C-alpha cells in the first residue's frame, strides 16, 4: 500500500476508532447508537465509493463497463461476446441497468458500494449491539480489499452473511435462493450453498482440535487442498463452474502468500484458540450460536 493510499486509509480508520468510543459511551449511558452507526456507514460509503482509480478492480471493470450495452442494445443482442462472457449474469445486468440510466463508471462504482453499505446496515443491526465496532473490524480485516479488489465477491459474501438467519431458522429454500442470487455475481457462492450442512452441525472440542491440526499441516506442508474440491465440482458441478472457481481461487489458495506467516494468519489462529479452547479465560460470550462458530471455522480453513 503506497503513501497516497495508506494516509487516507489510516485517517479514516482513526475516525472509525473515535466513533467506536462514542458508541461505547452512548451504550454505557443507555442511549441509542443507531445514528452514530448510520454516520459511520455514510463515511464508509464516501471513502470506499469515491476511491477513484484505487484498487485492482478498476483495471478489471473500467473497460468492461465502457463496452456494456444499454437495456435496448442488450435486448437486441447488440453487445460483444467478450463483455457478456467475462463475468456473471447478475453483474452484467447491473452494468446494463447503470448504463441505461446514463451512469459513468464512477457513479456505477459508488452506487455498487452504496448497496453493499445498505446490506451491511441491516446485517450488523441484526447481529450485534456494537455496530460501529463491527464496521471497524470489517474494514480493517477484509472490507477494503473486498470493495477495492474483489467487487463482485463482496456481493457474494454479503448475501451469504444475510442468508445466515435462514440457516438458524432451518429455511433451506430461502438460504439457497439468496446464495443463488449471490452466484449471479460471483460463482464462489456455490461453496456457500454446499456449506449448508456444515453450518448446521455442532462440533466437539476434539473435532475442533483435529480441524486446527489438519489446517496447520496444510499450511506447514503447503498442501494445495483446493484440488480435492475441484475434482468434485468437475464431476457434479460441470467443468465451466469448476474452471471459474479455480480461476478465482488460484491467487488465494495456490499463492505463496496463503502459506506465509502474516498478521492475519496469526490473529486468526489466536482467535480460533481463544473462541474454542479458552473462552472463559478471554471472556468470550456464551451467546455465540453454532452457525456463527461454524462460519468462523470455515473462514479459518480458507484464510
Model regions: which residues?
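Start-transfer (signal-anchor) and selected internal transmembrane alpha helices
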Residues: 1-44
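Transmembrane-helix signature of polytopic, membrane-embedded enzymes
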Residues: 31, 124-140
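Short acidic/glycine- and proline-prone juxtamembrane loop motifs at membrane-interface regions
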Residues: 148-154
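Membrane-interface transmembrane helices that cradle and orient dolichyl/undecaprenyl
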Residues: 160-174
Amino acid at each position: 500500500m503506497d503513501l497516497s493510499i495508506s494516509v487516507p486509509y489510516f485517517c479514516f480508520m482513526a475516525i472509525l476508532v473515535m466513533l467506536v468510543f462514542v458508541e461505547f459511551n452512548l451504550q454505557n449511558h443507555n442511549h441509542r447508537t443507531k445514528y452514530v452507526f448510520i454516520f459511520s456507514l455514510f463515511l464508509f460509503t464516501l471513502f470506499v465509493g469515491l476511491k477513484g482509480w484505487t484498487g485492482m478492480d478498476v483495471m478489471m471493470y473500467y473497460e468492461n463497463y465502457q463496452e456494456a450495452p444499454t437495456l435496448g442494445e442488450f435486448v437486441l443482442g447488440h453487445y460483444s461476446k467478450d463483455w457478456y462472457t467475462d463475468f456473471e449474469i447478475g453483474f452484467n445486468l447491473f452494468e446494463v441497468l447503470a448504463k441505461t440510466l446514463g451512469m459513468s463508471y464512477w457513479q456505477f462504482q459508488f452506487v455498487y458500494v452504496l448497496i453493499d453499505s445498505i446490506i451491511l446496515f441491516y446485517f450488523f443491526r441484526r447481529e450485534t449491539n456494537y455496530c460501529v465496532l463491527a464496521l471497524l473490524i470489517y474494514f480493517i480485516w477484509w472490507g477494503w480489499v473486498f470493495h477495492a479488489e474483489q467487487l463482485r465477491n463482496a456481493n457474494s459474501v454479503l448475501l451469504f452473511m444475510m442468508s445466515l438467519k435462514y440457516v438458524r431458522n432451518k429455511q433451506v429454500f430461502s438460504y439457497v435462493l439468496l446464495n443463488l442470487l449471490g452466484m449471479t455475481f460471483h460463482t464462489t457462492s456455490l461453496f456457500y450453498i454446499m456449506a449448508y450442512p456444515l453450518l448446521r452441525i455442532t462440533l466437539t472440542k476434539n473435532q475442533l482440535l483435529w480441524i486446527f491440526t489438519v489446517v496447520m499441516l496444510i499450511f506447514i506442508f503447503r498442501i494445495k487442498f483446493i484440488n480435492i474440491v475441484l475434482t468434485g465440482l468437475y464431476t457434479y458441478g460441470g467443468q465451466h463452474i469448476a474452471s471459474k472457481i479455480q480461476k478465482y481461487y488460484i491467487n488465494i489458495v495456490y499463492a505463496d502468500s496463503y502459506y506465509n506467516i502474516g498478521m492475519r494468519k496469526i490473529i486468526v489462529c489466536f482467535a480460533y484458540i481463544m473462541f474454542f479452547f479458552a473462552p472463559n479465560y478471554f471472556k468470550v460470550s456464551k451467546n455465540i450460536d453454532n452457525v456463527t462458530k461454524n462460519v468462523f471455522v470455515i473462514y479459518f480453513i480458507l484464510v
